[in-house]
Amino acid sequence: MAITQERKTQLISEFKTHESDTGSPEVQIAVLTESINNLNEHLRTHKKDHHSRRGLLKMVGRRRNLLTYLRNKDVTRYRELINKLGLRR
């Protein structure tokens, strides 16, 4: 259900903007998207897990805020990230 450290490192290396980058909006959004996708798979099989559903909604809200921040700050980076992750915004 949670992302492994190897997968997280892989996402960071894929979306980083500079060499020691771990906290840029792109990296945070990519890690959140991976967690959201994993939690969606979990909730498909465990429909009554409302505690995890609440966590999913919090993650989606956090990702939405980061996407709004990135769109306001740099539209080209925002569009590239949306296309790369395959999000529908």
UniProtKB/Swiss-Prot annotation:
PROSITE patterns per the UniProt record, alphabetical: RIBOSOMAL_S15
Keyword Cell division: no
Pfam family membership, one: Ribosomal_S15
GO-annotated molecular function: rRNA binding; structural constituent of ribosome
GO cellular component: cytosolic small ribosomal subunit
GO BP term, example: translation
Keywords from the UniProt entry: Ribonucleoprotein, Ribosomal protein, RNA-binding, rRNA-binding
Domain of life according to the entry: Bacteria
Described function: One of the primary rRNA binding proteins, it binds directly to 16S rRNA where it helps nucleate assembly of the platform of the 30S subunit by binding and bridging several RNA helices of the 16S rRNA. Forms an intersubunit bridge (bridge B4) with the 23S rRNA of the 50S subunit in the ribosome.
Subunit description: Part of the 30S ribosomal subunit. Forms a bridge to the 50S subunit in the 70S ribosome, contacting the 23S rRNA.
HAMAP family attached to this UniProt entry: Ribosomal_uS15_B (MF_01343_B)
Family, as annotated: Belongs to the universal ribosomal protein uS15 family.
Protein name as it appears in the record: Small ribosomal subunit protein uS15
Name of the gene this protein is made from: rpsO
